[in-house]
Curated annotation (Swiss-Prot):
SUPFAM superfamilies, per the entry: EsxAB dimer-like
Keyword terms of this UniProt record: Coiled coil, Secreted
Record GO cellular component, one term: extracellular region
Coiled-coil segments on the chain, per record: 12-43
Name this polypeptide is given: ESAT-6-like protein
UniProt KW Calcium keyword: no
Compartment(s) where it occurs, according to its Swiss-Prot or TrEMBL record: Secreted
Pfam families reported in the protein's UniProt record: WXG100 (PF06013)
Disulfide bonds: none
């Protein structure tokens, strides 16, 4: 017997929404941190300030990679759901055609 597959489209949609909300919250935090860093740097000069800037920039790059990954997961979930629904609809139409032929 072939393995069966079940897809919970509502759960898939909820997961996509949760990921999008999380990414938006993280973007907000990233913007707040950048603003706080800019404010701090406006009153701070010297080698320590420049070292902090370099570390912050690396941290911000990592932050951006996380956001890119979240955006990718969101897009994949959305596209997978769209593809699944289209295939499910096509399969249902095929079943309906066969049923119509059998019913004469």
């Amino acid at each position: 017997m072939a393995p069966q597959s079940a897809v919970d489209r509502a759960a898939m949609a909820q997961a996509a929404q949760d990921i999008e909300q999380s990414a938006n919250a993280i973007r907000g935090m990233q913007n707040q941190l950048a603003s706080a860093k800019d404010q701090l740097r406006s009153h701070w000069e010297g080698d320590a300030s420049m070292a902090f800037e370099a570390v912050f920039n690396r941290f911000n790059e990592d932050f951006s990679r996380v956001l890119k990954a979240l955006d990718g997961m969101h897009e994949s979930l959305v596209q997978t759901r769209i593809t699944y629904e289209a295939r499910e609809e096509a399969a249902q139409q095929s079943v309906n055609r066969v049923q119509a032929l059998l019913n004469g």
